[in-house]
Structure formats: C-alpha cells, structure tokens
Swiss-Prot record:
Name of the encoding gene: Il7r
Pfam (any one): FN3_7
Family statement drawn from the similarity comment of this UniProt entry: Belongs to the type I cytokine receptor family. Type 4 subfamily.
Name assigned to this protein: Interleukin-7 receptor subunit alpha
Domain notes: The WSXWS motif appears to be necessary for proper protein folding and thereby efficient intracellular transport and cell-surface receptor binding.
Transmembrane feature ranges: 240-264
Main location: membrane
Amino acid sequence: MMALGRAFAIVFCLIQAVSGESGNAQDGDLEDADADDHSFWCHSQLEVDGSQHLLTCAFNDSDINTANLEFQICGALLRVKCLTLNKLQDIYFIKTSEFLLIGSSNICVKLGQKNLTCKNMAINTIVKAEAPSDLKVVYRKEANDFLVTFNAPHLKKKYLKKVKHDVAYRPARGESNWTHVSLFHTRTTIPQRKLRPKAMYEIKVRSIPHNDYFKGFWSEWSPSSTFETPEPKNQGGWDPVLPSVTILSLFSVFLLVILAHVLWKKRIKPVVWPSLPDHKKTLEQLCKKPKTSLNVSFNPESFLDCQIHEVKGVEARDEVESFLPNDLPAQPEELETQGHRAAVHSANRSPETSVSPPETVRRESPLRCLARNLSTCNAPPLLSSRSPDYRDGDRNRPPVYQDLLPNSGNTNVPVPVPQPLPFQSGILIPVSQRQPISTSSVLNQEEAYVTMSSFYQNK
C-alpha cells in the first residue's frame, strides 16, 4: 500500500512539472517575439485572376518564428474594413477584388491581438510585374542576326499595360557578366557580329511597370533559353569580296588619271589655276584707238559712200514738180541763153570769190530748177574765177577742168566728162560711169570758161 502511494505521488509531480514547463514556454515565446525584428516587405499583382488582385507579404528575416504571427490590412478597401492574409509556409498572401487601388492601406504584423509592427502602403505603388513567358530565339541567315520574341501577360491587362522589359544574355560557359538590352516591345534582334562564333548563349527576360500611376518592382526572370551561334563563313578559304573591291578601286584610279590628263588644259587647269590676263591687251580692248585718217574734206567725192539728205532740196523738188507741167527737156536755144547769162554773171563777180563752194552750188540749184528746167540741175559746178595770185606766167598752164572742154577740132562731138552728182529727191547719189553729155551743155560750159579766161586776161 505504501508502494501504491509513492507511485501516485511520483505521477502527480510529473504532471505538475510538465504543466509548469509548458506555461513557461508560452511566456518565453512572447518575450522572444517582442525582442525579434519583424520588418517585412509586400508587393501587389493586378488582375492575376480576372478582376482579383494579389497581395503578398513576407518577413525580411527568414529565421523568425512565424508560428503565432499574422498579417492584417486595413483601409482602402471596398466593402470591408480589414482583411487578414493567408499563410503558406513563410509567405502571407490574399487574393481579392476588394482593393480600391486608390489611397493607402495600413498593413500590420499581429501576435494575437497585439500589433507588433505596421507600415502604410499604397497598392498601386508596390506593383510587381508578372514574368514574361514563351521566350524564343531564331537565327535569320539573310539578316545575319538573331530574332528574340516573348510573351508579356500585361498586354491583356486593364490597368497595367505599359511595362519595360530587360533582355539579358551571356555565353553559357566561361563568363558571368550579362549583356542587357532594354525595350518596350516583345521582340528584339541581336546582331551576329556582337556574338562569338560557334558558341552557346543563355538568354532570359524580365519586366517592370513603366507608368506614372502604377509603380513597383521587377518581375521574376523568365525561364532561360539557349541558342548557338553558327560557324564563320569561308573559314580558312578565299574571300572574293576583297580582291573585287581592290580591282575596282585600281580601275577607278586609272580612269581618273586618264581623264585628268585629257581634260587638264581645257577644263581642270583653268578652274584650279586660272591665268592672269595681260594688262596691255586688256587696255587695248577697253580703250578705242582714235581714227588717224579722218575725212575733213568738203569735196563731194569724199561723200560718195554717204547718202546726204537735204531738206531744202526736197522742198525745192516738191515745188518744181507742182509748178512744171511736164518734164520735157529744154530746147537748145534756151540752153544757150542760160549759158550766156551764166558767163556774164561770172564775169561781173569779184575775183576774191574765186571758188563757189559746194554749199552755194547746192543752194542755187533748186532756184535754177524753179526758174528754168530740171536739166539744168544736173550741170556740174564750175570755177567762177581763178585765184587772185594768178600770174601771167601761169596762163600757159592747162586749165584745172580741162576734161570739161571738148577738143578744138571737133566741137560738136560729145566729150566724156566726169559725171556730176545728180540732184534726185534731195540725195546726192554718184554716178559710177561716165556718159556723154549733150552738145548744148558742152557749149554752155565752154562758153563760160572762155568768158572767164578773157576776163582775167583783160584784167
């Protein structure tokens, strides 16, 4: 009986000891929980399952005992005040459509009814993009590059559509540095010249929100994909491109040398090296030389090449044509009377006016045409007298106008004389050929000349 009592006493003591140890353990857990660092992080993913959003939280220290800890979010919710996150190992999450996506929420770590730590976060600023998928790399032989394509889940989303992608690739062996390419589309190209020939490469891609309202973090890397670069072309062989370029270059240089040699004097040299003009020749071209042989004579023969229009002669001709009934030549008796009057008029003039200038003859000719007939207008001008210095010794000299006199033996034969300048329409036009004049005109000229000679002899 004593043995049975001892046994009950031992069992009771053991029960008390076990119960005391268990109570002390719970109190110790509370003390340890208060002393640990409960810092955490959270991120959201929008429209992961239709209109439902996902919120995920976890502690920064993975060694924390999370047996009695829980996460709770309050504020910026649609129909509820607070929501408690579900636990999956060391991760806390909740999938719901109650997020307002406007304003900030209060996320707290709780142990029982006690809040250990809290953070104020906005769901739209902690968005984590979804990882791209279906990454493919295709080699294009014609373009000599690699085409990289992948799928981004955000293209079909309602809220988050604009994201930035980061494509990273590196050789699969022997190198740890990644080459990054940033883009906003789901396809890109990698030129073959940037890759090593006949090498295996690893490539992967990730995304991050790129929006003014929705901001957040990089997504997880997509599953890696590998591709191999081809061998270099014509390795160890003959490249026909370089010789072709060399031959074309030499031929072009040879052609340029020939053209330069042919066109040097006519085209190239005047442009590259212009010649200076001679100043003497330039001055000769600019300055006109004065004429040395100026014709200042009043001789009618000097104006044979010129057409002289006399206004008075034209007026006199018009008056003659209006007064004369016909253009019949004058009778011989009238011609003799005219010659006699001309001789008497010449004898009565003073010796000082020895020669009748052409202007006097031209001025008197229209008057004679008016007084008598047009035939008298064609008579050549004669010397009215000789020079005042005329001497007796000069009498034996032949007269100046000897050609005007007929031969002494035959006075009735026409004598060729220089054709005078006929008066026609006020223009002096020379007659190139000598024509025989009428006998009456020759007699008048001879009579006038003999009369003047007798006048000088008497004087």
